[in-house]
From Swiss-Prot:
Residues at which substrate binds: 98
Name of the protein: NAD(P)H dehydrogenase (quinone)
Family annotation (InterPro entries): Flavodoxin/NO_synth (IPR008254), Flavoprotein-like_sf (IPR029039), Flavoprotein_WrbA-like (IPR010089), FMN_Rdtase-like_dom (IPR005025), NQO (IPR037513)
EC number annotated for this UniProt entry: 1.6.5.2
Source organism of this protein record: Acidovorax ebreus (strain TPSY)
Length: 200
């Protein structure tokens, strides 16, 4: 079976929750899954005063270990319609892997959160996916076979480009059951794709 990394950055815990759901989905397809986060670059005193969630249990990833996985699912919240600098800085350090083609043909995917329904979900997903394409990765999104993103009965995240959640202007909204189902669906689809590509 395939080996999957769920790599995320979470300021207030929404993406941490989504990452766990993505991992659940990947494990349900038989994949071996690690959940890791990128380093926080905001000084701890400032992060604490801004109420960042600093007690996240996932270990911090290193760039060099990325090539050890068959699939990498990247999650980060939006910052003005793109991924935040914490994730951008981490991926920028993967130039050596890019130069060697170390990630060519591996499976990639993205998930995100925004404060509002129209707060940059798709552009943030694109900002992540663009990096993964430059690394030579094969992209898996969240197809419309996941019916949860089609509903008009509730405020819900989700796009064909990846699973999403809506956090609210003050971060007061947690991922809904539908959004977590979307994350699990995408995680499972990534793992199933990696299993096919890598002989699982």
């Amino acid at each position: 079976m395939s080996k999957v990394l769920v790599l995320y950055y979470s300021t207030y815990g929404h993406l941490e929750t989504m990452a766990q759901a993505v991992a659940e989905g990947a494990r349900s397809a038989g994949a071996t899954v690690d959940v890791k986060r990128v380093p926080e670059t905001v000084p701890q005193e400032i992060a604490r005063s801004a109420h960042f969630k600093l007690d996240q249990s996932a270990p911090v990833a290193t760039v060099t270990e990325l090539e050890n996985y068959d699939a990498i699912i990247v999650g980060a919240p939006t910052r003005f319609g793109r991924m935040p600098s914490q994730m951008g800085s981490f991926l920028d350090q993967a130039g050596g892997l890019w130069a060697r083609g170390a990630l060519n043909g591996k499976v990639g995917a993205a998930f995100t959160s925004t404060a509002t329904q129209h707060g940059g979900q798709e552009t943030t997903l694109f900002s992540i996916i663009t990096n993964l394409l430059h690394f030579g990765m094969v992209i898996v999104g969240l197809p419309y076979s996941f019916q949860g993103q089609m509903t008009l009965d509730e405020v819900v995240g989700g796009a064909p480009y990846g699973a999403t959640t809506i956090a609210g202007g003050q971060g007061q909204r947690q991922p809904s059951a539908t959004e977590l189902d979307g994350a699990r669906f995408q995680g499972r689809l990534v793992a199933e794709t990696a299993n096919k590509l890598f002989g699982g």
